[in-house]
């Protein structure tokens, strides 16, 4: 049963475990994404923050949230998580409602490297979003088209080596848009630009 965007967004708020996974830190009206990274040449991790202003409504999920032991809980508790493809995930998934459109942004934080594994992380996160969408549809009948894009943020000193001639998308996966932290921090969520949009129906 297709429902309107507001209704589906309300359903996401109701069904997701927001008490554990939702990002609620704000700074001057902007949502704060925060993850520990190792800056170039450093052996000590620091909190890397990206502040994004929001138009419409946003539900920010820290998919890689650590528990009390410093590890991430399995995303699917009924499945063996050891070395399985569903054990991978990106750092953040943002559900963003603007009018009658719901966008989904999968975001991975990296430091001074852009390893091949980040492609697997973002692909696994897309699969998680599809699984979530399917689960809600099967159990409740509620459905709404989602528009998904994938991003990696980094402080790589020379990212051009890994990017297309325009310096935007990964050579290994053209659907993943790259931004430097310094270029995106403080901008609007609407500023995230990716022409490769996956539809989840």
Give the positions of each predicted feature:
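Acidic, metal/cofactor-coordinating or nucleic-acid-engaging core segments within structured domains
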Residues: 82-87, 114-147
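A structure-centric signal for secondary-structure junctions around beta-strands
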Residues: 89, 101-103, 147
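Conserved catalytic cores of phosphodiester-cleaving nucleases, focusing on short active-site segments
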Residues: 92-94, 103-111
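Short, flexible beta-strand-to-coil junctions
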Residues: 95-103, 154-158
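Short acidic, S/G/P-rich loop/turn micro-motifs used as interaction or catalytic elements
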Residues: 111-115, 157-160
């Amino acid at each position: 049963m297709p429902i309107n965007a507001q209704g589906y967004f309300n359903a996401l708020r109701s069904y997701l475990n927001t008490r554990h996974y939702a990002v609620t830190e704000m700074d001057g009206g902007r949502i704060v994404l925060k993850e520990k990274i190792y800056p170039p040449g450093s052996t000590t991790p620091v909190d890397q923050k990206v502040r994004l202003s929001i138009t419409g409504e946003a539900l920010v999920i820290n998919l890689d949230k650590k528990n009390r032991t410093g590890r991430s809980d399995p995303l699917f508790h009924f499945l063996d998580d050891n070395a399985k493809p569903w054990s991978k995930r990106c750092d953040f998934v943002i559900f963003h409602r603007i009018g009658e459109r719901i966008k989904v942004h999968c975001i991975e934080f990296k430091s001074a490297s852009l390893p091949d594994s980040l492609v697997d992380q973002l692909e696994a996160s897309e699969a998680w979003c599809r699984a979530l969408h399917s689960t809600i549809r099967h159990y409740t009948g509620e459905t709404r088209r989602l528009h998904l894009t994938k991003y990696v943020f980094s402080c790589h000193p020379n990212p051009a080596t890994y990017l297309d001639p325009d310096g935007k998308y990964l050579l290994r996966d053209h659907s993943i848009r790259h931004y430097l932290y310094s270029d995106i921090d403080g901008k609007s969520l609407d500023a995230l630009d990716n022409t490769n949009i996956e539809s989840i129906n």
